[in-house]
Swiss-Prot record:
Annotated source species: Ascaphus truei
Tissues showing expression: Expressed by the skin glands.
Keywords: Amphibian defense peptide, G-protein coupled receptor impairing toxin, Secreted, Toxin, Vasoactive, Vasodilator
Signal peptide: none
GO biological process, one term: defense response
Subcellular location: Secreted
Chief localization: secreted
Record keyword Secreted present: yes
Family note: Belongs to the bradykinin-related peptide family.
Known role: Induces relaxation of mouse trachea that has been precontracted with methacholine. May induce relaxation of arterial smooth muscle. May target bradykinin receptors (BDKRB).
Name of the protein in its database record: Bradykinin-like peptide RD-11
Domain of life: Eukaryota
């Protein structure tokens, strides 16, 4: 996933 997609999951 692109950076900042989720503050908890960035995979």
């Amino acid at each position: 996933r692109p950076p900042g997609f989720s503050p908890f999951r960035v995979d």
